[in-house]
Every structure is written in structure tokens, then in C-alpha cells.
Amino acid sequence: KFDEAYEYYKQQILAGKDADVIVFETMTDLYELKAAVLAAKENCDKPILTTMTFERNGRTFTGVSPACAAVTLTGLGVDALGVNCSLGPDELEPVVFEMSKYTNLPLVIKANAGLPDPNSNEYNIMPDKFAECVCSLLKYGVKVIGGCCGTNPDYIAKIKSEVADKEYQPQTKSVDTTVCSSTTVVEI
């Protein structure tokens, strides 16, 4: 239930009152994420970053599209939104692109190092390729970059060296007025 989720997140927010930032990540359900964001907005004044995890079909496990996530989370007043886990940075480009069409907020990407081999459990994207793929997403307004499953400090170091001479490119385009459910966006 929404109220129960809200109370759960409220308790966490209050317990972590000394945190610098609130991060909700690896979310699949937009309704739950709404409860979390509202609990944070109503119980602290910290910046809020949110990421959802998307499948190969471009939707979360519960069917949320990147556009619906972007519209809803922008409307809720988060400070940044994006994607983490599930896939490699190359496979997440369509997700990041779709989000960028519906928000001017800074985007977050914390991709996996690809997908693990079912036999060896080794991830298939090495640090150089990972950093290259992640950096190709900067054009969509990505400001927060990291790594999730299969990454390690070598990946983050490579990203750092790749972005050292690049400036954040905020999105300044006009974003159409929209309404949405958790699965469909309608432009007005």
C-alpha cells in the first residue's frame, strides 16, 4: 500500500537526517518510487536523485517506460533522474535518450558492465569500452555517472579520465506539456 511505503521511506529519511543527498535506486515500480520521493520531499530538504532499472524491452519489470518515469519524477520535483543496473551502457542508450526527451533535469546513469556470461559469470564489457559507451551518453544531459554490477574501481577511474576534459551539457530544449500513467505518456 502507498501509505505503508510512504511511512517506511519516511522512517529511513528521518534516520538518515545527516545524509548529504537522498538516492533512490534500482526501482522498478513508479508507484513505490512516488511514495519514496514524497516521503523525502515532505521530511527533508536534501537533493533527491532517483534511478529506475529497465529491461531489454525498454520498460521496468512493472511496465514503466522511460518517458513515464521522466515525466512523473520531473513533476515530483526530484533533482536528477535516470537509470541504473540491469544492462550495459550501450543497451541503455535508448532509455537515456527517451528520458532526455521528457525532462531537462540532469540525468544519472550507473550501468552494469554488460551482462554476465552464464557459464563463467564474467561481465562482457571491459573498463575502456564501458567508459567510452557511458561518455557517448553525455550529449543527452547525463551529469551523474557511475557503475553497477560487474564494475569496480578500474571502471570508475577510466570514466573519470574520459570525462576530465568534458563539460556538463545541460538540456535547455522546450519540453512539451504531458500527462501520463505509469505506462503511457500523452502530449498535450
Model regions: which residues?
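Domain-level signal for soluble alpha/beta catalytic cores
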Residues: 1-188
